[in-house]
Amino acid sequence: MSISSDEVNFLVYRYLQESGFSHSAFTFGIESHISQSNINGALVPPAALISIIQKGLQYVEAEVSINEDGTLFDGRPIESLSLIDAVMPDVVQTRQQAYRDKLAQQQQAAAAAAAAAAAAAATSANNQQPPAKNGESTANGEENGGHALANNHTDMMEVDGDVEIPPSKAVVLRGHESEVFICAWNPVSDLLASGSGDSTARIWNLSENSTSGSTQLVLRHCIREGGQDVPSNKDVTSLDWNSEGTLLATGSYDGFARIWTKDGNLASTLGQHKGPIFALKWNKKGNFILSAGVDKTTIIWDAHTGEAKQQFPFHSAPALDVDWQSNNTFASCSTDMCIHVCKLGQDRPIKTFQGHTNEVNAIKWDPTGNLLASCSDDMTLKIWSMKHDTCVHDLQAHNKEIYTIKWSPTGPGTNNPNANLMLASASFDSTVRLWDVDRGICIHTLTKHQEPVYSVAFSPDGRYLASGSFDKCVHIWNTQTGALVHSYRGTGGIFEVCWNAAGDKVGASASDGSVCVLDLRK
């Protein structure tokens, strides 16, 4: 038997990821140097740690229940143990002695019952009553039956059958060999990109004229070793299409960003980060790519040459998210609790926002680029303006960490100028909230999810919001009324949801390696 600390650490790291503890997984991965291990994560099946623990538990159960000669202990079947029971000292001897004591009590009780039965046999013969006919029932029986039926419910939140998306309207795409962290629709066609822990991204063709159904292109992320390309065996952590839909950028735990054509060909490999990449975005013009990494830096890349235009080393801890304000100005956030606004060509931030008291998970500029929203593990959502040094709104309603935020594509500067601007926040408290930022109030609290919510996305017209949670559900909400209008339960925890450009399909990526596409057309 051979067990290394690297192997144990990797299984713990994967368990944290699969269970939705993304921040814990990140911290543990850094401290245990997971990125430097040679373990091929694509070959390790999901739930590997749980599987090996279950086998160990079964071994202890066998120890309790089986004698040294292989026979069942006192003829009984294998006893079920909890995990905590199994690690207790002397569990085998303790359980076997407890069973001996119980067996002795049962034998004594059986002897007493037999004597009582013999004594009552004579009198019972004189007091027999005819048995009830088939089909007869007592009033008490009816009452108990009704009570049992009334209480036959589950803890799972009930969803109205009218809003459930039928299987005929859901396409489940299989191919990834590990959890799928991210997905994004091409902005001009029905191509869906996905990124996974199996060190691949994939492009799925969901268009009506696809000749062979939903075809997939596999984008394998490789690194150079010994003069040849070998799989990186690292998670694909981020991806983004350019505005024309011709190029896909991906970021990986191997520290490289890559640019691919929509046909799946590798166009460029961008290598200057000194560790995993956590976020990556194209600017609107399509000439620059922005990335954020664990090395505490952000980098603007020239998309045409693949060269780094400028590296910004201003954070004191890993950078978690980035968002463009304009074609050459952006904001970044970090576990250092700070937000920096930087501009290409400037050697220091043009603005720094401070006020969060825990790591800042996500940032997003509103459609006009005037307001910046941020969310944090401090359970607050803050709104910032370049005209002020402190936040203009400090929104406190969630009671657990806020994982992500999205602005609606409505209001000034959008294709829906007459609709009100809204902000959505998704939290580990299992709720989604919709905010009127102008007034600084929560207008809807969406509460059907049962587990942490990892992703929200507005439809292109802003009328609907999709949310995805680790409860395996994708919910579609009416943003005006807060009503649930569609619901789908998948086969794995949902990491990401996204709308296609036409607003009639929702893509979702899941922890079990599946990608599902929901067709919302009537």
Swiss-Prot record:
Q: What GO cellular component term, any one, is given? A: histone deacetylase complex
Annotated localization: Nucleus
Asked if the keyword Transcription belongs to this entry, the reply reads: yes
Which terms are listed as keywords in the entry?
Activator, Chromatin regulator, Nucleus, Repeat, Repressor, Transcription, Transcription regulation, Ubl conjugation pathway, WD repeat
Q: Where does the LisH domain lie? A: 4-36
In terms of SMART domains, this protein maps to: LisH (SM00667), WD40 (SM00320)
Q: Name one Pfam family in it.
A: WD40
Question: What's the entry's take on its domains?
Answer: The F-box-like domain is related to the F-box domain, and also functions to recruit ubiquitin E3 ligase complexes.
Q: Where is the signal peptide?
A: none
**Protein name as catalogued:** F-box-like/WD repeat-containing protein TBL1XR1-B
Q: State the residue spans of region: Disordered.
A: 122-150
Instruction: Relate the protein's function as given in its record.
Output: F-box-like protein which acts as an integral component of the N-CoR transcriptional corepressor complex. Probably regulates transcription activation mediated by nuclear receptors. May mediate the recruitment of the 19S proteasome complex, leading to the subsequent proteasomal degradation of the N-CoR complex, thereby allowing cofactor exchange and transcription activation.
Question: For this UniProt entry, what is the primary localization, expressed as one broad class?
Answer: nucleus
Q: Where is the composition biased (Polar residues)?
A: 123-141
Partners and quaternary state? Interacts with heterodimers of rxra and thrb, and this interaction is abrogated by thyroid hormone binding to thrb. Interacts with ncor1.
Which InterPro entries does the protein's record reference? Ebi-like (IPR045183), G-protein_beta_WD-40_rep (IPR020472), LisH (IPR006594), WD40/YVTN_repeat-like_dom_sf (IPR015943), WD40_repeat_CS (IPR019775), WD40_repeat_dom_sf (IPR036322), WD40_rpt (IPR001680)
**Tell me, what is an example of a GO biological process annotation in this record?**
regulation of transcription by RNA polymerase II
Q: Name one GO molecular function term.
A: transcription corepressor activity
Query: What ranges cover the WD repeats?
Result: 175-214, 231-270, 272-311, 314-352, 355-394, 397-445, 448-487, 489-522
Q: Which intervals hold domain F-box-like?
A: 41-86
Family affiliation:
Belongs to the WD repeat EBI family.
